[in-house]
């Protein structure tokens, strides 16, 4: 339907359109839709296509002589309340993102383009792993593509999606269908394989008696809930101190008052344990929302939440934008976690800070929980902006864990060679295996070897598309770029630098090699490895965690994915193999993130009646961050870190705005960044320091070169207006894109 005379309509609507547009557009309201209200999701025409938008305002006049009509209501039946509309505009202004792009956060259950739903399938092995390996040995020579499919299926703990399997194995559907005809695998509807309710109970809840500090925190939160006034509480509790029990009781109190709750967790994987605990307490009132759900599941959850039939919602950052009826409580668990920050595309929002703003707009109580609070949150608590509650002791059955620091410089001298496991660590692992207790090993690098070079000229192999060293993954026998996930089709036969015959020299280690070494030292050991290689497919993370929690393995090896919020009662030893690795990164948050990571990993040990022990290997044993982490002394760490932040004018004493410019030509990208930078020099006041243009830490990603500069300011929105003006004046080349990251988690990468 084309443009119509505006006089045809009695009512007009200002619509926020789900497109890259930073303003509302006027549309005519047909007579049959005159009942629609502010916040209603509608279908409209834009540039010849159908889009979804949300009505911002109904009015009786328009400045347009001709106008497009609203086509109809969106199938999602979503209506955004006033507080979410206000939040949408605030996010757009604060995080420097077009209204249309920001709107997509609030409508995750539907596409901005109206498309037909598609069926999703999973691929399941019909044979045992042993039998499949026999079949693989016969097939991989005669039918390499079928062999590639079976290798992927054997590698993962749960059935992958059909499209994911095709992409990972780099095959069409043909070899998969051939294997299906041979009776080796099945292709089934994903709905048949959804995680059943009874599988969620492998983390059994136990009734808890509150200790005095917990009771004090509960009293403060209950007081906020009863007054229906906005307050933000920082629940600062050491690992294992009973923060989850406080979440449960606060949620129960909110329900008694007829209020709903949103509980945010950093990653999807953590929803399994959390949902288990909450469903055991609240039953069908609990819902889950995350981006891996189907569109129909997301639409159903949003509708139930907005109608009030679903009163508790658990999920990662995307769950924050659900239109809950009578929202009274927002909980952000592990509030310090970097996963709460959106970094891939605008708006680059931080879910913790947006949660606080949503609480303010909805007159709700906000609870931020962490054993290692961000410096920003702790500073807000000390200043009185947040209500502070401390939990300084572990819950009833748990004992304080013993922590030891191992100087790897001395261990290397003793062994006269490079080692990954010190003798004290191997001894402690052997002791746990002897008595049937479990061990957790943290190593924050995946793959087998992290550096591959030419033995002749020592040239290190890098990704041709990125400024990144390639990592060798032994199981798949590939060199992989961890930035763009590309890999050479075959291992190189000649060196690109000296042109000689390529004999590869392998250095460095990842979780895959750690697992292999452990199996060589302890032949009977049962291991589970959790990293982004073993958890690519839907349900794989949950399956591996369930296997470990139910005693199917002795040792859990993993990257930072295993550091967050997991509660394994039989784990009595946590080993951090490379405690200082993050300290070498030239970033103002490096020490904070290392301290948080060590503390969180250490907190996985000794969480029940069995005493726990933590071993930290480090080549920087005298570093103050390592010492504070070893003593679990947050106050000491905060005191030393906050002094440096204030001296150098970094958060929490100032706001940072990171301006990133990206283009295929490095010279042109640098020039365009400088053009904007020079305009801002003239516009910004001396109270807003402007840092020079520099290459990003990851200078080249996917054949795109990246430059950046930083702006420091006490107030973001006024600077954003000047930045917008500078970008308009600069008239950037269409070949150079930009992204604005307000309150960045890193100023390096």
Swiss-Prot record:
Aminoacyl-tRNA synthetase is among the record's keywords: no
GO molecular function terms listed in the Swiss-Prot or TrEMBL record: 3'-5' DNA helicase activity; ATP binding; ATP hydrolysis activity; DNA binding; zinc ion binding
Residues reported to bind ATP: 237-244
Span(s) of short sequence motif DEAH box: 333-336
EC number assigned by the record: 5.6.2.4
Keywords of the record: ATP-binding, DNA replication, DNA-binding, Helicase, Hydrolase, Isomerase, Metal-binding, Nucleotide-binding, Primosome, Zinc
The UniProt record lists the keyword GTP-binding: no
Reaction(s) catalysed (UniProt annotation): Couples ATP hydrolysis with the unwinding of duplex DNA by translocating in the 3'-5' direction; ATP + H2O = ADP + phosphate + H(+)
Binding site for Zn(2+) 2: 463, 466, 481, 484
Cofactor: record remark: Binds 2 zinc ions per subunit.
Family: Belongs to the helicase family. PriA subfamily.
HAMAP family named among the record's database cross-references: PriA
The protein's name: Replication restart protein PriA
């Amino acid at each position: 339907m084309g443009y119509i005379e505006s006089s045809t309509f009695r009512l007009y609507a200002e619509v926020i359109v789900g497109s890259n547009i930073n303003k509302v557009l006027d549309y005519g309201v047909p007579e049959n839709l005159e009942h629609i209200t502010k916040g209603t999701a509608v279908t409209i025409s834009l540039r010849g296509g159908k889009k979804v938008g949300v009505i911002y305002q109904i009015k009786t006049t328009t400045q347009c002589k001709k106008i497009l009509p609203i086509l109809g209501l969106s199938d999602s039946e979503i209506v955004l309340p006033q507080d979410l509309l206000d939040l949408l505009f605030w996010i757009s202004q604060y995080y420097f993102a077009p209204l249309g792009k920001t709107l997509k956060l609030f409508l995750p259950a539907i596409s901005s383009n109206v498309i037909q739903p598609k069926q999703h399938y999973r691929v399941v092995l019909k044979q045992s792993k042993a039998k499949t390996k026999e079949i693989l040995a016969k097939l991989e020579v005669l039918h390499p593509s079928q062999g590639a499919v079976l290798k992927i299926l054997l590698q993962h703990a749960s059935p992958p999606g059909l499209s994911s399997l095709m992409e990972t194995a780099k095959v069409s559907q043909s070899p998969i269908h051939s294997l299906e005809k041979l009776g080796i695998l099945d292709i089934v509807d994903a709905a048949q394989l959804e995680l059943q309710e009874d599988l969620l109970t492998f983390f059994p809840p136990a009734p808890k008696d509150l200790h005095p500090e917990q009771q004090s925190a509960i009293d403060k939160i209950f007081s906020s809930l009863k007054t229906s006034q906005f307050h933000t509480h920082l629940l600062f509790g050491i690992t294992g101190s009973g923060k989850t029990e406080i979440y449960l009781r606060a949620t129960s109190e909110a329900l008694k008052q007829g209020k709903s709750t949103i509980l945010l967790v950093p990653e999807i994987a953590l929803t399994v344990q959390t949902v288990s605990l909450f469903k055991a307490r609240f039953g069908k009132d609990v819902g889950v929302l995350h981006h891996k759900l189907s569109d129909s599941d997301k639409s159903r959850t949003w509708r139930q939440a907005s109608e009030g039939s679903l009163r508790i919602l658990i999920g990662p950052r995307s769950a924050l934008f659900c239109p809950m009826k009578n929202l009274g409580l927002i909980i952000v668990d592990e509030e310090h976690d970097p996963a709460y920050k959106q970094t891939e595309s605008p708006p680059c929002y931080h879910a913790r800070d947006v949660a606080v703003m949503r609480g303010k707009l909805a007159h709700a109580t906000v609870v931020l929980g962490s054993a290692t609070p961000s410096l920003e949150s702790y500073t807000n608590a000390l200043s009185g902006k947040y209500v502070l509650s401390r939990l300084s002791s572990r819950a009833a059955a748990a004992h304080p864990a013993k922590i030891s620091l191992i100087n790897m410089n001395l261990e290397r001298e003793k062994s006269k060679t490079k080692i990954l496991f010190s003798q004290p660590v191997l001894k402690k692992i052997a002791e746990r295996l002897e008595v049937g207790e479990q061990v957790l090993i943290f190593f924050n690098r995946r793959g087998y070897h992290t550096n591959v070079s030419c033995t002749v000229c020592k040239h290190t192999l890098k990704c041709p598309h990125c400024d990144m060293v390639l990592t060798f993954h032994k199981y798949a026998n590939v060199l992989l770029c961890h930035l763009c996930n590309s890999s050479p089709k075959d291992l190189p036969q000649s060196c690109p630098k000296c042109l000689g015959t390529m004999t590869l020299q392998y250095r460095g280690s990842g979780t895959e090699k750690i697992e292999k070494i452990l199996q060589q030292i302890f032949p009977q050991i049962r291991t589970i490895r959790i990293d982004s290689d073993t958890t690519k497919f839907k349900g794989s993370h949950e399956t591996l965690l369930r296997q470990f929690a139910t005693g199917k393995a002795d040792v859990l090896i993993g990257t930072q994915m295993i550091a967050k919020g997991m509660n394994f009662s039989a784990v009595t030893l946590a080993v951090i193999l490379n405690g200082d690795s993050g300290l070498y990164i030239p970033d103002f948050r490096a020490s904070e993130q290392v301290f948080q990571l060590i503390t969180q990993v250490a907190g996985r040990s000794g969480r029940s009646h069995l005493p726990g022990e933590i071993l930290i290997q480090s080549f920087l044993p005298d570093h103050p961050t390592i010492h504070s982490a070893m003593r679990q002394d947050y106050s000491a760490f905060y005191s030393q870190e906050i002094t440096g932040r204030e001296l150098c004018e970094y958060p929490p004493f100032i706001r940072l705005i990171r301006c990133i410019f990206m283009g295929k030509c490095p010279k042109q990208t640098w020039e365009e960044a400088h053009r904007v930078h020079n305009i801002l020099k003239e516009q910004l006041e001396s109270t807003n320091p402007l840092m020079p243009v520099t290459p990003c830490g990851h200078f080249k990603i996917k054949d795109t070169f990246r430059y950046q500069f930083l702006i420091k300011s006490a107030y973001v929105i006024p600077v954003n207006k000047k930045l917008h003006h500078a970008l308009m004046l600069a008239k950037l080349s269409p070949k150079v894109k930009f992204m604005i990251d307000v309150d960045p988690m890193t100023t390096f990468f």
